[in-house]
């Protein structure tokens, strides 16, 4: 019996069929039927709800822009739902997860996880299901960003570059305000 759990973990990691089978019984893998339909069209799909995803969601909330969260961490999805926001649990590089996030009617896909291969898969799926979707991706290195840009996968952001731009903007603005 001790081998069952590791075998299940291995099967889910290596088989889309096993992941789909696992999702059938997971109530967090689909949006509740009570989800307001106006939230399911023209929305932003935010993949990953770590620090970056939460910050993006906060800005979207301030601007009253609808979004759906897709995250592989069940506890995160539960917390998002408790906060009254729509969220689905699962690996968003699996088409089922993006379908559950209503990617077919979404205006934008925002991928905050720094996984180049998974990001590419998510964009491919999203564009097949919704050819006019806009995509925004996070890259963890300039090399990864260059690969994503070369393949025209969307607007690409690298954390260190964005931080440097923000700091430089602040410094130059403060220094320009000083006399002399």
Feature locations, PLM:
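Cytosolic regulatory regions of ion transport systems
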Residues: 1-180
């Amino acid at each position: 019996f001790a081998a069952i759990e590791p075998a299940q973990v291995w099967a889910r990691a290596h088989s889309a069929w096993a992941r789909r089978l696992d999702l059938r019984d997971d109530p967090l893998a689909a949006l509740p039927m009570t989800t307001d339909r106006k939230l399911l069209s023209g929305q932003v799909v935010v993949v990953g709800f770590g620090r970056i995803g939460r910050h993006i969601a906060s800005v979207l909330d301030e601007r009253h822009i609808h979004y759906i969260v897709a995250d592989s961490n069940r506890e995160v999805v539960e917390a998002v739902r408790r906060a009254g926001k729509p969220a689905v649990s699962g690996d968003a590089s699996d088409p089922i997860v993006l379908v559950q996030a209503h990617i077919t009617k979404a205006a934008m896909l925002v991928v905050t996880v720094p996984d180049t291969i998974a990001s590419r898969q998510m964009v491919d799926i999203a564009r097949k299901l919704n050819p006019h979707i806009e995509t925004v991706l996070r890259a963890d290195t300039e090399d990864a960003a260059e690969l994503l840009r070369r393949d025209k996968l969307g607007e690409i952001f690298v954390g260190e570059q964005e931080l440097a731009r923000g700091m430089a903007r602040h410094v130059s603005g403060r220094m320009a305000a000083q006399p002399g």
